[in-house]
């Protein structure tokens, strides 16, 4: 009934199911892709130094993320696949727990199940009690609610995770699209006091640059000893 009502609107219905963009890709991006089409070949698994440097500079310029090196960045061929395989490649497996938001992007749960871990839904650290999960996904701004996790909340998550050795993957694909307030990256030093151990930020050009289906994104942060395994297996 709600859908039928929306379809009767003069401007038509807006499909929010998968966030498909309705605007065209920026002409400058179209031109850059066309120019690069004459250079076939497989890319470096970890990305070119120029690309990784550009990502580091962009994070600092846009989101005040400082202190990153090029080695802290891994370009990925689509963030959906990277998210789905991230716990597995970082050593999560049977007997482990992966915490995911109560209402969330379905691929977080898929990621836990693929690794063989147990997914646990929780929006509050209090819900987890004394447990020490191996891995945690957070999402700010949230898909689908739009909720932004504030500075105080993020600092508590980081401190809690550092005490327990929990890896935190912050899905920041919508960080440039906050409706209320200014979203913060988990890699911002105001959040982590300069200690990014076990903290990963996920970014997708599908949202920030209107490039859905282009399979372009990256992960930034400080990977643990499994980082090389992650980079190689994601190739």
Give the role of each language-model region:
Residues 2, 26-30, 51-53, 154, ...:
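A general structural signal for well-ordered alpha-helical segments in protein cores
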Residues 191-235:
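Conserved core segment of the aminotransferase class I/II
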Residues 1-43, 164-166:
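N-terminal "arm"/small-domain region of PLP-dependent enzymes with the aminotransferase-like
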